[in-house]
Amino acid sequence: MAASCVLLHTGQKMPLIGLGTWKSEPGQVKAAVKYALSVGYRHIDCAAIYGNEPEIGEALKEDVGPGKAVPREELFVTSKLWNTKHHPEDVEPALQKTLADLQLEYLDLYLMHWPYAFERGDNPFPKNADGTICYDSTHYKETWKALEALVAKGLVRALGLSNFNSRQIDDILSVASVRPAVLQVECHPYLAQNELIAHCQARGLAVTAYSPLGSSDRAWRDPDEPVLLEEPVVLALAEKYGGSPAQILLRWQVQRKVICIPKSITPSRILQNIKVFDFTFSPEEMKQLNALNKNWRHIVPMLTVDGKRVPRDAGHPLYPFNDPY
């Protein structure tokens, strides 16, 4: 069952539901990927920083390619360039490492994971003596030019951005000869991202939602905060359509043409998450879900400084979340 797709400006078809692999432990992610492929997933979302690309690569090697269960051209694989690899000289080696780990000859989509650069080197989170991050002055426009060279070499089919705001997207568009095809950001009914999605769609970028279920497993969640999966309107729609609350949240996104990459290592949930194409919400039901928006951003990298939790990068000039969207 091929999940419905979004057509990218590159002509590629990107499946609306993919398997997310952030926080999937090595030791579990290989089986999750193999199971997902077996039930019809054709989109896997990866990143170098997740630390599990070698294991995902084992699954891809076993199940993808000539004479195997899934032809390579039917699979859409995304990965992401980490912050320590923004210097133009580091971009291709970083991609080559990801390709070697994933045991692939090319990526369908390569994203710049964050707009700002960390100090070059092999420590993914280089720190100053006071515990703050060591940044590098490389601007994302320089990094973008190096990414474009990967497309010219046939190593990457499309480029995109992650955690960029509207101004930064336009900044990239002003210098790009290879235009970004996708923006990946946190998005769920509590953070509907309506303005940012409209901004992207007007400029030919598709949007991928990470943490589409609201990331209630995050360590820093306030115990008094409402839980998206337990919202009365979500539960009522789940009952009406005979689905799970997660399916309701995913259906809301795909009906807005927003790609989702729910993470799971549980076979029953992996299967459930892709079964969102056999029912449709009425405009009124979409409105009820839209009304949950609180502009609540859950995924903000934090640091503990002097015993207090503070946003890690909020003082950086390229920090994306100080703008309205």
UniProtKB/Swiss-Prot annotation:
One of its GO terms (biological process) is aldehyde catabolic process. The modification N6-succinyllysine is found at residues 127, 145. The modification N6-acetyllysine is found at residue 127. It catalyses: a primary alcohol + NADP(+) = an aldehyde + NADPH + H(+); L-gulonate + NADP(+) = aldehydo-D-glucuronate + NADPH + H(+); L-gulono-1,4-lactone + NADP(+) = D-glucurono-3,6-lactone + NADPH + H(+); allyl alcohol + NADP(+) = acrolein + NADPH + H(+). Its main location: cytoplasm. Its EC number is 1.1.1.2, 1.1.1.372, 1.1.1.54, 1.1.1.19. Gene3D superfamilies: NADP-dependent oxidoreductase domain (3.20.20.100). The active site is at 50 (proton donor). It is found in: Cytoplasm, Cytosol; Apical cell membrane. GO terms for molecular function: alcohol dehydrogenase (NADP+) activity; allyl-alcohol dehydrogenase activity; glucuronolactone reductase activity; glycerol dehydrogenase (NADP+) activity; L-glucuronate reductase activity; methylglyoxal reductase (NADPH) (acetol producing) activity; S-nitrosoglutathione reductase (NADPH) activity. Pfam families: Aldo_ket_red (PF00248). One of its GO terms (cellular component) is cytosol. The modification Phosphoserine is found at residues 4, 38, 211. Coiled coil: none annotated. The modification N-acetylalanine is found at residue 2. Keywords: Acetylation, Cell membrane, Cytoplasm, Lipid metabolism, Membrane, NADP, Oxidoreductase, Phosphoprotein. The record marks 80 as: Lowers pKa of active site Tyr. The keyword Membrane applies. The keyword Acetylation applies. NADP(+) binds at residues 11-22, 45, 162-163, 211, 213, 215-216, 263-266, 269, 272-273. Catalyzes the NADPH-dependent reduction of a wide variety of carbonyl-containing compounds to their corresponding alcohols. Displays enzymatic activity towards endogenous metabolites such as aromatic and aliphatic aldehydes, ketones, monosaccharides and bile acids, with a preference for negatively charged substrates, such as glucuronate and succinic semialdehyde. Functions as a detoxifiying enzyme by reducing a range of toxic aldehydes. Reduces methylglyoxal and 3-deoxyglucosone, which are present at elevated levels under hyperglycemic conditions and are cytotoxic. Belongs to the aldo/keto reductase family. This is Aldo-keto reductase family 1 member A1. It comes from Pongo abelii.
